Amino acid sequence: MSTYAIIKTGGKQVKVEVGQAIYVEKLDVEAGAEVTFNEVVLVGGETTKVGTPVVEGATVVGTVEKQGKQKKVVSYKYKPKKGSHRKQGHRQPYTKVVINAINA
């Protein structure tokens, strides 16, 4: 059974395995840099370690592949019979990370 981990990043929890590419909320690092996630909630595989709230000494190491923005989301407000409307677009920034190692 392959080793996996659940990490906390950007206010979300993400299940990761070695070699997997994940998209997380924007991190302030350059593309090609190595990033370490210290908030590991669970490590699974042969045995499972559950943190209270995090697993002591466990880290997940990954490499930043690229920074980007998601597709545009358009919100539109409209007041009937008043001629009032407003259109606003938003593109959420993200970071693509490839997981290199899970250290339990």
Curated annotation (Swiss-Prot):
Keywords: Ribonucleoprotein, Ribosomal protein, RNA-binding, rRNA-binding. SUPFAM superfamilies: L21p-like. GO terms for cellular component: cytoplasm; ribonucleoprotein complex; ribosome. One of its GO terms (biological process) is translation. It comes from the Bacteria. It holds the Pfam family Ribosomal_L21p. InterPro entries: bL21-like (IPR028909), bL21-like_sf (IPR036164), Ribosomal_bL21 (IPR001787), Ribosomal_bL21_CS (IPR018258). HAMAP family: Ribosomal_bL21 (MF_01363). This is Large ribosomal subunit protein bL21. It comes from Streptococcus agalactiae serotype V (strain ATCC BAA-611 / 2603 V/R).
